[in-house]
Structure formats: structure tokens, C-alpha cells
Amino acid sequence: MSRDLPSLNALRAFEAAARLHSISLAAEELHVTHGAVSRQVRLLEDDLGVALFGKDGRGVKLTDSGVRLRDACGDAFERLRGVCAELRRQTAEAPFVLGVPGSLLARWFIPRLDQLNRALPDLRLQLSTSEGEFDPRRPGLDAMLWFAEPPWPADMQVFELAPERMGPVVSPRLAQETGLAQAPAARLLQEPLLHTASRPQAWPAWAASQGLAAEALRYGQGFEHLYYLLEAAVAGLGVAIAPEPLVRDDLAAGRLAAPWGFIETDARLALWVPARLHDPRAGRLAQWLREQLAG
């Protein structure tokens, strides 16, 4: 123990007993036993080498040394309470800056943003796009949404939200015109497949899951971002592949179809938070995201 400052637990126990003029009331306030408070006070007296309490007929009585320490502790704890309250207010009032890949932001997050604002009104969410740039440690970010595979780095608090599910999607019109709606997965080896540079392994991984040779795939039009890839699929330009959340609303609205379903990959959609931030809003956001993704 440092000789400069006694145990903070002991000081806290003493301050409560001195302020309330009662060991029992101090124990009740601190949610510990009478004996625990008494032991902490004795440890403090031993450490300081002075008696802090005496006895009178009605309970504990402060000695002169006890009065001095009570006043010092009262001032110190009051200042601490004030600073902590101010820090909590700053956290509550500051926006929570969340990095989201642009495609996920446009196709899944923004359509649910009003629900989020109503569910977590204290979040004060500020969104930042991060297409193609995975850097959860970027200055100014409080958290980032991203698909990635474990293990997770030690300096990040990672909230796993949902497994990544990938699958081919096509416009219903094109599926009917070409017979793709009822075709087996192997039929896609005959189609020029829409693809994106941001997900170069998506088609090969899907082909392997279907027992198909990746080298037999035929690639058609390429796009820089998933968002444009999916717009092309909606327009009937070919078959695309994407994570399920990005096409969930399109499937529900009939703009896209997924005749071959979705496969689960090794990746997870996760909320990445630098461990040093300790912002409780991250946990509340993660829980809301889990519920939405599971729906």
C-alpha cells in the first residue's frame, strides 16, 4: 500500500460513518456488513496511527483527528462526484460516431434509422461511411460495423451481432425470363455473374459450398461497390451475390429473389469498439442491432 494515500475503500467507509454518525447506517449505504465498515475504519486508524472515533453514550464520536479527516474526505468525495457527473453528462451529450460500410448504410441501416432513434433516443448517433476502409481505431470514431472473421484483437471490444450469410440474388423478372427461378445452382456456371472488387472471394466461396468448381465461374460486369452491384441486379442486368441484410428489404419488396438461398460463412457482422473508450452506449446499440438482424 502506498504511504501517501490510504486505501480508498477504507476512506470511503470512514467518510460514510463520519457523515452519518453511525457504523450501521454507513454499512447500509455502502451495502456491506457492519463488521466490514468497522474493519475498514480500524485499518485506516492503523495506517494513519491515530484514533478517528471515540465512544459516547449514543454511538460513535469523532476525535479531533477524525473531524479533520472527515472534512477533507467530504470535500474530496464531493469534488469526485461532481467531476464524475460532468463526465457522464459529456458522454451522454456527445454524439456516438458509428462507421458503417456505405452499402450496408444505404440498404439496411438508413431504412431502420428512425426505429433506432426512437428505441435509443439518448444515443445521438452520427453516421460515417467507411466503404472499403476497415479502420475501427480511426480518430473520431466511437465504433464501427464490419464483416470480419475471428479471432478478435485484444485492444478491441467486439460485439458479435450475426453470422454472415451470403447468396446469389436476381431480379424476379430476369429469373422468370431465363428460367433461373427453378434452375439448380449449377445453372449459374452458364451465366455471366455480376461481381464487385470489394468481395472478390464471394462467388468462389459460394461455388465451393455448392460443390462447384470456382474456376468454372463466368464473370460479367464488375462494380467497385456492393451498392452498385445490387442496383444492377435490381435492374435485371444479371445475377449478383451479397450478404443477406443488404438485400433483405429488396427481397421483401419483390425487387430481388434468392432462388438458391444463403450460405453461412466464417465471417461475422460485428460492432467494433476500441476497448479504451468504455462507452456504455455501445452495448445498448449492439443489443438493438442483434434484435434487428435476427428479425
Swiss-Prot record:
<feature type="DNA-binding region" description="H-T-H motif">
    <location>
        <begin position="23"/>
        <end position="42"/>
    </location>
</feature>
<comment type="similarity">
    <text>Belongs to the LysR transcriptional regulatory family.</text>
</comment>
<dbReference type="InterPro" id="IPR005119">
    <property type="entry name" value="LysR_subst-bd"/>
</dbReference>
<keyword id="KW-0804">Transcription</keyword>
<keyword id="KW-0010">Activator</keyword>
<comment type="subunit">
    <text>Homotetramer.</text>
</comment>
<dbReference type="Pfam" id="PF03466">
    <property type="entry name" value="LysR_substrate"/>
</dbReference>
<dbReference type="InterPro" id="IPR037418">
    <property type="entry name" value="TrpI_PBP2"/>
</dbReference>
<comment type="function">
    <text>Activates the expression of the trpBA genes, which encode the two tryptophan synthase subunits, and represses initiation at its own promoter. Acts by binding to two adjacent sites in the intergenic region. In the absence of the inducer indoleglycerol phosphate (InGP), TrpI binds to site I. In the presence of InGP, TrpI binds to site I and site II. Binding to site II is site I dependent. InGP strongly stimulates binding to site II and is required for maximal activation of trpBA.</text>
</comment>
<keyword id="KW-0822">Tryptophan biosynthesis</keyword>
<dbReference type="GO" id="GO:0000162">
    <property type="term" value="P:L-tryptophan biosynthetic process"/>
</dbReference>
<keyword id="KW-0057">Aromatic amino acid biosynthesis</keyword>
<dbReference type="GO" id="GO:0032993">
    <property type="term" value="C:protein-DNA complex"/>
</dbReference>
<feature type="domain" description="HTH lysR-type">
    <location>
        <begin position="6"/>
        <end position="63"/>
    </location>
</feature>
<keyword id="KW-0805">Transcription regulation</keyword>
<protein>
    <recommendedName>
        <fullName>HTH-type transcriptional regulator TrpI</fullName>
    </recommendedName>
</protein>
<keyword id="KW-0028">Amino-acid biosynthesis</keyword>
<dbReference type="InterPro" id="IPR036390">
    <property type="entry name" value="WH_DNA-bd_sf"/>
</dbReference>
<dbReference type="GO" id="GO:0006351">
    <property type="term" value="P:DNA-templated transcription"/>
</dbReference>
<dbReference type="GO" id="GO:2000284">
    <property type="term" value="P:positive regulation of amino acid biosynthetic process"/>
</dbReference>
<dbReference type="GO" id="GO:0043565">
    <property type="term" value="F:sequence-specific DNA binding"/>
</dbReference>
<dbReference type="InterPro" id="IPR036388">
    <property type="entry name" value="WH-like_DNA-bd_sf"/>
</dbReference>
<keyword id="KW-0238">DNA-binding</keyword>
<dbReference type="InterPro" id="IPR000847">
    <property type="entry name" value="Tscrpt_reg_HTH_LysR"/>
</dbReference>
<dbReference type="GO" id="GO:0003700">
    <property type="term" value="F:DNA-binding transcription factor activity"/>
</dbReference>
<keyword id="KW-0678">Repressor</keyword>
<dbReference type="Pfam" id="PF00126">
    <property type="entry name" value="HTH_1"/>
</dbReference>
<dbReference type="GO" id="GO:0006355">
    <property type="term" value="P:regulation of DNA-templated transcription"/>
</dbReference>
